[in-house]
């Protein structure tokens, strides 16, 4: 997986009303993904983690979700 800089991540998130979503799921899991558009019209690939992870692991999972969304945009224009 391509690793992006924090600056690239920030610029990506500031464009097109993007936001990171953490969705709590049954079975002690969370899906973390990037939504795009004012109404969340486009959803990026999800990173699934355990619900009981610490704040540092959660931050890293959010970075991975942003990186996956960045890769998806790079591939599809």
Regions found by a protein language model. Name each.
Residues 15-72:
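Short interaction-hotspot residues at assembly and binding interfaces
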Residues 2-20:
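Long, leucine- and charge-enriched amphipathic alpha-helices
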């Amino acid at each position: 997986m391509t690793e992006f800089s924090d600056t690239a991540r920030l610029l990506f998130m500031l464009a097109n009303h993007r936001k990171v979503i953490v969705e709590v799921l049954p079975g002690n899991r969370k899906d973390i993904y990037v939504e795009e558009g004012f109404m969340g019209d486009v959803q990026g690939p999800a990173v699934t983690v355990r619900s009981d992870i610490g704040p540092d692991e959660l931050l890293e999972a959010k970075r991975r979700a942003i990186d996956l969304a960045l890769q998806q945009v790079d591939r599809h224009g």
